[in-house]
Amino acid sequence: MIKVVPKVLVMSGYGINCETETAHTFQKAGAKTDIVHINDLIAGKKKMADYEIIMFPGGFSYGDDTGSGNAFANKIKNNLFDDLKEFINSGKLILGICNGFQVMTNLGLFALPSTDYGERISALEANTNNRYECRWVHIKENESICVFTKGIDIIHVPIAHGEGRFYCDEKTYLELKENKQIVFTYCDSEGNPANKEYPLNPNGAYYDIAGICDKSGRIMGLMPHPERSLYSISEPEYQLKKEIAKRNGEIIPEFIESNIQIFKNAVEYFNK
């Protein structure tokens, strides 16, 4: 059987700044990528329908003015939302990381069984310590319906955000939980819940939530950056781990497999 190589539209423009490493990670996972400025979509030079995956990367779109991800989301709402809904209804995939998650939250892409796309169900607010957090954390997959996280348990990933505190009301939380839409939660290295305690939970996120998906499992957003932790050499204490492995006659793998697996799962979705 001929393997399908999905095309990824990596969104760019107005302060998004993680498009290069995000495109690189998808390429290593087996996809083709185009970095596309949002204005080229609005002008019709590029079309969402020509792609299988839309990627909203991290960054600081519009400098986080009017709130993180808000202005970029409004640009999409006012110019591209019909195209985006058509893309969703065609059964394709959407992923958002950090600022991309914030944009998608403002767009209302994380529909519940009781809501439709375009209805906002949650928020990503300022970290409780009012500080920009830039370090590594552990997150655990919650046996969700998300297609991006098949075979993933605990992963070690960097964060870089000042507004990452997930919030929703109790009714929404219960529906997310019931429908297995809570994808990642903050934890310790053994997978024990952070219980909203700092520094395991870096931003005070309600219920330790680091990432969620929509009711179909095809649309995911998360605050941590797996695309920035593709290679083992990027991990903290890499040199120490390398030396220990050397003394044991072992070799550290090139990739952090659990992190690239998110992107491989997206590619494999089109080869079922």
UniProtKB/Swiss-Prot annotation:
Part of the FGAM synthase complex composed of 1 PurL, 1 PurQ and 2 PurS subunits. Keywords: ATP-binding, Cytoplasm, Glutamine amidotransferase, Hydrolase, Ligase, Nucleotide-binding, Purine biosynthesis. Residues 8-243 form the Glutamine amidotransferase type-1 domain. NCBIfam families: FGAM_synth_I. SUPFAM superfamilies: Class I glutamine amidotransferase-like. Part of the phosphoribosylformylglycinamidine synthase complex involved in the purines biosynthetic pathway. Catalyzes the ATP-dependent conversion of formylglycinamide ribonucleotide (FGAR) and glutamine to yield formylglycinamidine ribonucleotide (FGAM) and glutamate. The FGAM synthase complex is composed of three subunits. PurQ produces an ammonia molecule by converting glutamine to glutamate. PurL transfers the ammonia molecule to FGAR to form FGAM in an ATP-dependent manner. The keyword Hydrolase applies. This is Phosphoribosylformylglycinamidine synthase subunit PurQ. Its EC number is 6.3.5.3, 3.5.1.2. Pathway: Purine metabolism; IMP biosynthesis via de novo pathway; 5-amino-1-(5-phospho-D-ribosyl)imidazole from N(2)-formyl-N(1)-(5-phospho-D-ribosyl)glycinamide: step 1/2. It comes from Methanococcus maripaludis (strain C7 / ATCC BAA-1331). It is found in: Cytoplasm. Pfam families: GATase_5. GO terms for molecular function: ATP binding; glutaminase activity; phosphoribosylformylglycinamidine synthase activity. The keyword ATP-binding applies. The active site is at 98 (nucleophile), 225, 227, 235. PANTHER family: PHOSPHORIBOSYLFORMYLGLYCINAMIDINE SYNTHASE. GO terms for cellular component: cytoplasm.
